[in-house]
Design a protein with these regions (language model features):
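Pyridoxal 5′-phosphate
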Residues: 1-409
Length: 409
C-alpha cells in the first residue's frame, strides 16, 4: 500500500517538535538534510535508560546486563537497517565525522607514499577532509570532477581508479544537491583494482533501503539523527575488513569487531534511541521479520518523499528569479532534497525571512564546500536547501512556496 498522506498525518502526532509554535504558527521543519525530528518513542527510550540502567556494561548485576542487552539489540537493529550479516559488523561513535577520521587514520597507516585515494568534489567534507589529510603521508588524493548538472563525471571517476588506488571514498547521495551516485560502478571499478570502497550514506539512509551485502562495500557510514534518532555515528564494516586495520585503542580494550573502533564508554542512552528509531521505521512497513519491515517501510517513505519533493521542485522552478540545482526528478533515484538560488538575494537573507515565518530551511554550503565552490555559488551565500522527511506534508510545501513567491517579487 505504500506510505500515504494519511500515514503522514498519523505520524505527525508522534513528533512532539511539530507542535512547537513561533509567532502563532506551527514550525514547518523542512530541514531534514540537516537533521530530523524524533518521535516520542525515541525520547522515551532514551529517558528509560537514564531511569533504569544508566550503568556501564560488563557488570555482574541486572542493570549492567540489561544495558549490555540493549546495546546488542541496537547493533542488531542497525544491521537489519543496513542489510548487514550480523551485529558484529556495526560500530558506534560520536558522529560520522569522527568515525571517518578514525577510519582514514587507520587505513592511512597501511598505505605508502605514492598510493592513491579517490574522493569527489560533490561530497560532504566529512568524507573529504579525513582523506585529504593523508597527503601528509605522501598519499596522492584524486578528486572526481563535479559537472554543472550536479552529477559526478563518471568518465573522470573511471580514469582515476588504477593499480595505485587503495581507497575509493564516495557519497551515496549529496546532502547539497540530492544527487544519488552510481555506487555499483564505484564498487565494480574499485573491486577491479583491489581498492577499498568507503561509502558515506548519511544523506542516503533516511530515504532509501540499504543493502551492504549486495553493494559489497568495505565500509559504510551514516548518522542516526538523520533518520529520526539521536546524534550517534554508525560504521558498518565488511566482515574481515576491520580486523586488518591498526586502530588507536586501549591495551585492555576488546580488539575484536565491532568494539575495535569504539573507544571509552559509549552514549548508551542515545544508542538505545537508535534502536527505537529503527523500530519506529519498521512499524510503518510490513514483512515477516525486522529487515523485511524496514525495507517495505523505506520503499513507501521514499516514494512519498520523492513525490513531495518533485512537486515542490516543479513549482518553485516556476517562480521568477529561481534556479534549481541538481538532477531532475524524472529519475527514481533522487534524494528529496531541493536546493535553489534567487536572483539578487543572498541565501542567508532568504532563509532568515522564512525563519521569521516559522519555516525551517537551511542555507550555505552544508559542509559540501567544494561542490558550492565548483558551482560558483560561494560568494552568493551558497544555496537555499529544502529537504523532506516522512512527517512533512503538502500544506507545508504550500506555505513555503507562498512565502518564496512573496520574497521573489
Amino acid at each position: 500500500m505504500g506510505f500515504t498522506a494519511d500515514d503522514c498525518a498519523r505520524c505527525r502526532a508522534d513528533f512532539p517538535a511539530l507542535r512547537t509554535m513561533h509567532g502563532g504558527r506551527s514550525l514547518a521543519f523542512l530541514d531534514g538534510p540537516g537533521g530530523s525530528q524524533v518521535p516520542l518513542a525515541v525520547i522515551r527510550a532514551i529517558e528509560n535508560v537514564y531511569a533504569t540502567c544508566n550503568v556501564n556494561t560488563g557488570g555482574q548485576y541486572p542493570p549492567s546486563r540489561e544495558i549490555g542487552r540493549r546495546l546488542h539489540e541496537a547493533r542488531r537493529a542497525v544491521a537489519a537497517l543496513l542489510g548487514a550479516a550480523g551485529p558484529e559488523s556495526i560500530s558506534f561513535g560520536q558522529n560520522m565525522t569522527t568515525l571517518c577520521f578514525s577510519l582514514a587514520h587507520a587505513i592511512g597507516r597501511t598505505l605508502s607514499a605514492g598510493d592513491a585515494v579517490v574522493i569527489t568534489e560533490l561530497d560532504h567534507e566529512a568524507n573529504r577532509s579525513p582523506w585529504l589529510m593523508l597527503r601528509e603521508r605522501g598519499v596522492t588524493v584524486r578528486e572526481v570532477r563535479l559537472r554543472a548538472s550536479g552529477e559526478l563525471d563518471l568518465d573522470d571517476l573511471a580514469s582515476m581508479i588504477d593499480a595505485r588506488t587503495k581507497v575509493v571514498a564516495i557519497g551515496a547521495s549529496s546532502n547539497a544537491l540530492g544527487t544519488v551516485n552510481d555506487l555499483e560502478l564505484a564498487r565494480r571499478l574499485s573491486t577491479e583494482v583491489g581498492a577499498l570502497l568507503v561509502v558515506d550514506a548519511v544523506h542516503y539512509a533516511p530515504h532509501f533501503a540499504i543493502d551492504v551485502q549486495r553493494l559489497r562495500c568495505d565500509f559504510l557510514l551514516c548518522s542516526a539523527y538523520k533518520f529520526y534518532g539521536p546524534h550517534v555515528g554508525i560504521l558498518y564494516s565488511r566482515p574481515g575488513a576491520l580486523e586488518r586495520l591498526p586502530t588507536d585503542r586501549l591495551s585492555a580494550q576488546n580488539p575484536a569487531p565491532p568494539y575495535r573502533f569504539e573507544t571509552g564508554t559509549l552514549n548508551h542512552a542515545a544508542i538505545d534511541g537508535v534502536r527505537a528509531a529503527i523500530d519506529y521505521i519498521a512499524a510503518l512497513g510490513r514483512g515477516a521479520d525486522l529487515r523485511a519491515r524496514i525495507v517495505d517501510a523505506m520503499h513507501g517513505i521514499g516514494a512519498y518523499e520523492h513525490a513531495l519533493a518533485a512537486d515542490y521542485c516543479r513549482r518553485v522552478a516556476a517562480l521568477p528569479g529561481v534556479r534549481v540545482y541538481g538532477p531532475g526528478f524524472d529519475r527514481t533515484m533522487r534524494a528529496p532534497t531541493v536546493s535553489i538560488t534567487l536572483d539578487g538575494r543572498h541565501a542567508g537573507e532568504v532563509a532568515a525571512a522564512l525563519g521569521e515565518q516559522a519555516i525551517c530551511v537551511w542555507d550555505g554550503d552544508f559542509y559540501a564546500v567544494r561542490a558550492v565552490e565548483v558551482l560558483g555559488l560561494a560568494a552568493r551565500g551558497g544555496l537555499l536547501r529544502t529537504g523532506f522527511s516522512l512527517y512533512n506534508n503538502r500544506e507545508e510545501v504550500d506555505r513555503l512556496l507562498s512565502a518564496l513567491a512573496d520574497i521573489a517579487r
